[in-house]
């Protein structure tokens, strides 16, 4: 056994753990900032989607932001007569969280009765209640079209660590 303080340089086991935890928290913050960043849509990439976790007194909500290139639209609801794909949001939470229904803004009628679209930027909210911590993932899917063509269906998954 060696006598001496545990905190000698090179023996700072507690500090190393704190540094690892700090690095993990910093990495989570960078990931959250990247997920929240909005990329400007272009003709070749007409829809960009970003998401961020917004905490509140009951738990929080995922705020999903869609930005659309001028002239394109995405579908909110699709009539059985139309072949399009509507916006989907699939959220996975750990047991103990209570997942609310996604809150969409009003969409405008388009073509066939029963089909509605968004043709400008919009935000969807997904409320989640619970005081627990843990991972939450949210997969967002959509199809965009302009007056000449439709893009293949697309999706993106966002992951958050709730603390």
Which functions belong to the PLM regions below?
Residues 1-163:
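Extracellular/lumen-exposed scaffold segments
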